[in-house]
Amino acid sequence: MAVRRDSVWKYCWGVLMVLCRTAISKSIVLEPIYWNSSNSKFLPGQGLVLYPQIGDKLDIICPKVDSKTVGQYEYYKVYMVDKDQADRCTIKKENTPLLNCAKPDQDIKFTIKFQEFSPNLWGLEFQKNKDYYIISTSNGSLEGLDNQEGGVCQTRAMKILMKVGQDASSAGSTRNKDPTRRPELEAGTNGRSSTTSPFVKPNPGSSTDGNSAGHSGNNILGSEVALFAGIASGCIIFIVIIITLVVLLLKYRRRHRKHSPQHTTTLSLSTLATPKRSGNNNGSEPSDIIIPLRTADSVFCPHYEKVSGDYGHPVYIVQEMPPQSPANIYYKV
């Protein structure tokens, strides 16, 4: 029984590990987005539209300023908001910033993991076929870091629309078949990718057309993740059922062992009814003392006196005692 349980456990763990590795290998690390007004990917009136799938990762980076870069450092607080806030470019006091770009000497990065369930209490969770919005109401200066309305969201359309689990072709985009990327660059953007720092000049020989070649088949990623979740749930339910059956079996065996009859030495009724005689009792018969067996004194049945009827007929022990002559006998004449 124990060997069989061990083999079942090993089989379930092996299936879970294989499925986890398969799901991880299918996930995509999206190219990072540099949050700066120099990023030409933020289109006027539209912002940046992405089509991530469940399992993908996305980095939002506030680039640092050093001697090799051009321009000044821009201060931002980046928030995830609802559609109404994104349309009006406003935030609420209870909104928590995803990014606080206030350190010019280092890159500040926030990684978004597109997952339906987060192991972290404060982690982000996403649902398929739902839109999510990221904006910043700061104006780029240190004094306007804590603005709660307007800012670059309104003046430079620095906002991100993330259509999780959706296909770009179904949204009316015919120029890009990659569901995890927004449509191709508009004319006049000089081929600059959204993953390139706005402070670095683009390489004339580089091209972003090859990025979509390695991401074919991502439209079925959602179904594969759903299949993985279903198989994992089935394995967990199967393990719970096995554990429940084992516990019930142990309880049944313990109860059956507890109520099993004790093998005690009993005397027949004929032995109890026949008095025993001894050769040196001087003609007198021995006194037969019948003592009931008090199983309550035994360590095996401490509750015998309460449920003694459950153990069958009472058992008696006969103890022989030598006759005793009376010490003082008085006769009335």
Swiss-Prot record:
One example GO MF annotation: ephrin receptor binding
Write out the tissue specificity statement of the associated record: Lung and kidney.
Disulfide cross-links: 62-101, 89-153
Query: Which Gene3D superfamilies did the record assign?
Result: Cupredoxins - blue copper proteins
Membrane topology of this protein: Single-pass type I membrane protein
Q: Which UniProt keywords apply?
A: Angiogenesis, Cell junction, Cell membrane, Developmental protein, Differentiation, Disulfide bond, Glycoprotein, Host cell receptor for virus entry, Host-virus interaction, Membrane, Methylation, Neurogenesis, Phosphoprotein, Receptor, Signal, Transmembrane, Transmembrane helix
Chain segments annotated as transmembrane? 230-250
Q: Where does it reside? A: Cell membrane; Cell junction, Adherens junction
Q: Where is the composition biased (Polar residues)?
A: 190-213
Q: Tell me which Gene Ontology terms the entry assigns under biological process.
A: adherens junction organization; anatomical structure morphogenesis; animal organ morphogenesis; axon guidance; blood vessel morphogenesis; cell adhesion; cell migration involved in sprouting angiogenesis; cell-cell signaling
Position of sequence motif PDZ-binding: 331-333
Q: List-wise, which residues carry Phosphothreonine?
A: 274
- This chain's protein is named Ephrin-B2
In its UniProt entry, the species of origin is given as Homo sapiens
